Amino acid sequence: NGVSPAAGYFGTISRAKYSAVAGSGSVTTPTTPTTPTTPTTPVAAGSGLTVALAGDTAAAGLFGESFASRPFTKINFTASADGDITVKSVTIERTGQAQDSVFSGIIVLDETGTRIGTSKTLNSNHQAVLNEPFTVKAGTTRGMTLAGDSDNNQDAYAGQIATLSLIAVDAGSATVNGTLPIVGNGMTVNSTLA
């Protein structure tokens, strides 16, 4: 055909190149845009948490052998109305005239009596830090109970009186209001009650 690279000629080589670049010529139908949604507003953390001994805290009683989740001290945790409060940890101290070994573990119970997290043993300062977080919704109160577990032999401690005290609360940036320690009623160790 006598045409060498001539300007304006659209031959087989040009058509092949065009087809490779332009594609097969199929038409893509655009998708229908979705309706925008309103973004969720994050819940602000509350500014204050009030802690106080609950009026229905456990009465003085007995603490026998192989007890699990024996209620000692019920604490009301009340969040300010301006936001939810997450309690990151509570520090409990064994007080009273009992030895630490009266307890095989210390635990927090929620309003239904369900154990929150794993029980902890007392350290050399007679304290246990329970760091399973729980939330108190804005403007509400949760009654949480400090409870104790015992082993199967309390013979060496019979007659001793133990109490569990709330001595510290970590509520993050929220101010904790209330007079600490908060102490419940004494429980008398009994080696014949199981």
For each predicted feature, which ranges?
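A short amphipathic alpha-helical interaction element
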Residues: N1-A6, S14-A22
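Exposed, polar/acidic Ser/Thr-rich sequence context and nearby capping/turn residues
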Residues: P5, V21-A194
